[in-house]
Amino acid sequence: MAVSARDYWDLTKPKVVALIVFTALVGMFLAIPDMPTWLQVRTGALGFLGIWLAASAAAAINQLLDAKIDAQMARTSWRPLVVGKVRPWQVLVFAGVLIVISMTILVVWVNVITAVLTFASLIGYAVIYTVYLKRATSQNIVIGGLAGATPPMLGWAAVTGLPTSADWINASLLVLIIFIWTPPHFWALAIFRRADYAKAAIPMLPVTHGVPHTRKQILVYTVLLAIVTLAPVAVGMSGMFYLGGAAVLNAVFLWYAWRMLNPPDELFSMKMFGYSIVYLMALFAFLMVDHLLLPWVR
């Protein structure tokens, strides 16, 4: 049976990758203090493409290495490799082609530092997290979350090359936001899917330490997140428009985290999971709008 374009598309986890590359795009915009030059637009577009292809390759490799686990979980049992729509060698070739194209674009037309950081992130997620951390520790998503948090830095690097310490610091603050956001985001899902994780012998926190402990950890990380999101204002990267938007988003996220301690029903954790996605997209949208369209409110 021939492999369809949709099957290859599904291998890339398009919804997950869309959020990843959006934060990379915001990193690009924040890195440029004024209107971008034509060269910056061209470099940014190529950087965006390279980062997107690398993230897609990482997603495909993750599905290749996790096929046995995915087959045991209701949430992932439909994936193309699990149901036999694609063969493992086809996934490997597909991912390899994406990596080669991505690295060629980044090295030749963007810059080496972006290529190196992007490749390191790919290895961090597709290999270190998927092969080792996911199966080894209940802190898998905390430690492994660093690889998934780097896209804003990758975007920043694409248009600047990270030439100064200020560039590294500002880009790192954006990475820190996603890094702290990842545990409450993923643990909310893990609470709802804990039976699947237990069946697949994946030591997610709700499986190893119980749901009440996980709910408390979600609250702790959500409080930390609310604090960390003040950093762009503290360093002068963003202004009052972003601060106001972040305050509203954080208030709702904190309410969800507090309510999670005694949720009204089993589905509440999925509601928090859904909001966490909206939260991150909106937070980075506020960063971008504040930077591009509302300089007068700073």
From Swiss-Prot:
Its EC number is 2.5.1.141. InterPro entries: Protohaem_IX_farnesylTrfase (IPR006369), UbiA_prenyltransferase (IPR000537), UbiA_prenylTrfase_CS (IPR030470), UbiA_sf (IPR044878). The chain crosses the membrane at residues 16-36, 45-65, 93-113, 114-134, 141-161, 172-192, 218-238, 241-261, 277-297. GO terms for molecular function: protoheme IX farnesyltransferase activity. Its main location: membrane. GO terms for cellular component: plasma membrane. Pathway: Porphyrin-containing compound metabolism; heme O biosynthesis; heme O from protoheme: step 1/1. Converts heme B (protoheme IX) to heme O by substitution of the vinyl group on carbon 2 of heme B porphyrin ring with a hydroxyethyl farnesyl side group. This is Protoheme IX farnesyltransferase. The gene is cyoE.
